[in-house]
Amino acid sequence: MKVSKRNRIALSFLAVALSTGIIIGFIVNSVITHRVIYETQERVKEALNGARWIYTARMNEIDRGIYFTSVRYILRGAFEKEKVLLIKDDMERLIADYGLDFLTLVDKNGIVLLRFHNPGSSGDSLIKDPFIREALKNKGISGTQVLSRSELLKEGELLADRAAFNLIPTPREKPTEELTESSGMVLKSAHPILDANGKVLGALMGGVLLNRNYEIVDRIKSILFKDTKYNGKEIGTATVFLGDLRISTNVIDREGNRAAGTRAMKEVEEQVLEKGLPWMHRAFVVDDWYITAYEPIRDIQDKIVGMLYVGILENEPLPGLKPRVSGLLT
């Protein structure tokens, strides 16, 4: 059957119109998609500021507790009279009030007089510990530190066991021959104890172990992401890493468990841990893609020891979330 010239022209115009419509639709969709990704990434960057604030706030809370206790007359008096056990009950209240995992008193030479959380362990020297060294120089100090299993065992076997992980294979991780991790990351503070003349008598040191401690990451999720879910999955997540290992996280795996013991994507590890640069891109997190932000965590000697992460599920629905407390973000 022959098609008239008029019909051929009409069909040509129709084909051009359809093609143009498809192209325009593709361009519009691409522009919208990139805009949504850009806006989500900006929100994640802002959320990372909030996460850092929350992490630092917990550290400062511990530091205040140690400082105000170190200047109490009852502590100084017991120290001078060498009757440290008399203040044990007061120190145990401090441990409970500030959620401390360890609290230790040392003399002016760095010798442990008493571990209030583990009274059976004392008499060893902590003079090589950088926190103790600074405190005995009459300087207060707080920060992040990584402790080996042998160091953790001095604080208690239960604490050392809580720190230990069997590594769980994770897609896109950097290959490793290691099967376990036994070190622990702690938030820690130490302050000098002075006599009436300002002479250093010793130091008080305390802190919390972050391994399997979900207080900070859950606070980040609750404040910044409102605990919102999509198809049963948390939209906003947070993690504290020791190296590239998730030691505290609310990322959930396919079995419905926290993904502690899994590792970060290889590209993230190389940029953040090896180069010391933040990662502000999409990343594969355990079993899904997220719009993410990672930054290094450094110890008091400026060594990179881990990472702080926040992420928003990439396939979250529009219009999405905005952090609830932008006034906290700096």
Model regions: which residues?
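Juxtamembrane extracytoplasmic/periplasmic/luminal helical "stalk" adjacent to the first N-terminal
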Residues: K5-D101, K108, K139-R149, L167-H191, ...
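Extracytoplasmic/periplasmic sensor domains and loops in membrane signaling proteins
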Residues: E80-D90, I111, R115-E177, N213-D227, ...
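Short acidic/glycine-rich beta-turn/loop cap or linker motifs at sensory/regulatory domain boundaries
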Residues: V106-I111, N197, L210, L242-I247
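Short, hydrophobic beta-strand elements of compact beta-sandwich sensory domains
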Residues: G202-L209, I291-L318
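Membrane-interface helix-start motif
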Residues: V3, L313-T330
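Amphipathic alpha-helical bundle/coiled-coil segments
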Residues: R52, T56, D129, G207-L210, ...
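A short, hydrophobic, proline-anchored segment that marks a local hinge/packing element in signaling
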Residues: L167, L187-G198, L209, A283-V285, ...
